[in-house]
Amino acid sequence: MPQYRSKTSTHGRNMAGARALWRATGVKDDDFGKPIIAIANSFTQFVPGHVHLKDMGQLVAGAVEAAGGIAKEFNTIAIDDGIAMGHSGMLYSLPSRDLIADSIEYMVNAHCADAIVCISNCDKITPGMLMAALRLNIPVIFVSGGPMEAGKTKLSDQIIKLDLVDAMVMGPDKNVSDEDLAKVERSACPTCGSCSGMFTANSMNCLTEALGLSLPGNGSMLATHADREQLFLEAGERIVDITKRHYEQDDYSVLPRAIACREAFENAMALDIAMGGSTNTILHLLACAQEAELDYTVADMDEMSRRIPQLCKVAPSTPLYHMEDVHRAGGVMAILGELDRAGLLNSDIPTILSPTMKEQLAKYDIMQTDDPKIIDFYRAGPAGIRTVKPFSQSCRWDTVDNDRAAGCVRSLEHAFSTEGGLAVLFGNMAVDGAVVKTAGVDNDNLTFTGPAKIYESQDTAVAAILGGKVVEGDVVVIRYEGPQGGPGMQEMLYPTSYLKSMGLGKKCALVTDGRFSGGTSGLSIGHASPEAAAGGVIGLIEDGDIIDINIPTRTMDLKVSDEILAERRIAMDIHGWKPVSRERHVSTALKVYALMATSADKGAIRDISKLK
């Protein structure tokens, strides 16, 4: 029988001083012996997805204490990728994932907490918290802040739906008037919550449902909707239940590594592919698998991408649907239900809520249940009122979207495509793999051959695109932007957005050892591994070299002979695999990150072999 971890600091004469300090935080005599639940919040006023989380920790704390636990809240950092985008601030985004994981480990282990409730939402916060949870392997539940409502505005006498990416694309587009741009800017992000499309934040929050570590609706219920409050309250109540089951009933099945097992990671990847999630999710799932000590690789993901169909299509891959529409169609449980009926889901594994995923789907998949409470839950919709307050509205759709032939979520027979929304490419340009969000690639661009235009920073690529130096047929290559080379593996949302602004969105390809925002669409291939700074072939490409991309065959090749590449490699070995000329201040903190970072095919995690 495992002992409560908290007894280390709450029991015995030698801990009189520690108990005195616990008392100073509000712990009373009859509290000692109760499980201590750490509430890892991520409130900040910098990030729309987190601006409303200030009181969420105490909401959960109240539920924890009512259920018989001691709740202690702390906060992690949270970076807004959209605000940090397009300048040196983006160097810090991915490294913050590791800092978040470490900060949770530090707080939870230093204070001997027994379990964790992770209150996350945006891009690096959810994966950082997942890494910590799987590293610590103590009872955990995830509850996120929820998605933003989609924006709406009137352009050319039409009401259109909007999101952040629309504002980014229209900004440099000279065909968009100042008046229309102002309308879009003011309408694109109308409420608190994670940006409204299937971008990285929402993708990751959906994946926590597939991993079995969050409650149904966590990934899709709007931040503004009153129904979301119940997710926080239930998380607080349930964490006490599973914590007592582990420590008092010797139940190891409730631990995160038991729930988020290899089969659960396969479910998460199946969901990711089926819903056309962000390519960043591949990076984060690889990192989380490492923390869980699972042998799960890009090769496994590649195999799945060939047999999992795309059953859901959401912005930025289509303007028709946003997260509020995914929720109306039944959310993550609906997509998992369709995968299960197609024989593509491991449904006999546990979740934090049910003994098996199959039992959970029987209750929460709108195509299986006739429970009016569940149907009502998935009718929760947007109010269309600008606000930063959570739970501020209770609007509902008249009906759920259960149209599996032409709705937001499709059945296998009516899939958007027979292959999924993400793919891994291999070839001499990416020996260890590169990733592309096929959900956002036009069918005419599934194969593409063109000359390389080489840029050794995002900044120079942006200047070239906006300056008219990139033309139809080019393959824009942005290198030395990987985990080591950046350092920090910047997102390339602005280059892809500006290609669209210049009318080149379907006429060019972009390849990088950096990564892409979940808001990216088009023929944008990232995570090329090994990265240039690690000696990858992407560092050997020269202007005018022909690059051949073939998504159906999952290949990406540089049409240069092995002999010429060998000669170039000798020259680069002498040069030191660094940009020929690039002015960039790299802080000491980022240099430390770069020293330990692996390439994207390993999840950009730390190379712990360097510690031996």
UniProtKB/Swiss-Prot annotation:
The enzyme's E.C. designation: 4.2.1.9
GO molecular function, one term: dihydroxy-acid dehydratase activity
Catalytic activity annotation: (2R)-2,3-dihydroxy-3-methylbutanoate = 3-methyl-2-oxobutanoate + H2O; (2R,3R)-2,3-dihydroxy-3-methylpentanoate = (S)-3-methyl-2-oxopentanoate + H2O
GO cellular component, one term: cytosol
GO BP annotation list: isoleucine biosynthetic process; L-valine biosynthetic process
InterPro entries tied to this protein: Dihydro-acid_dehy_C (IPR042096), DihydroxyA_deHydtase (IPR004404), DiOHA_6PGluconate_deHydtase_CS (IPR020558), ILV_EDD_C (IPR056740), ILV_EDD_N (IPR000581), IlvD/EDD_N (IPR037237)
Active-site residues, Swiss-Prot/TrEMBL: S517 (proton acceptor)
Textual note on the cofactor: Binds 1 [2Fe-2S] cluster per subunit. This cluster acts as a Lewis acid cofactor.
Residue positions where N6-carboxylysine is found in the record: K124
Protein name per the record: Dihydroxy-acid dehydratase
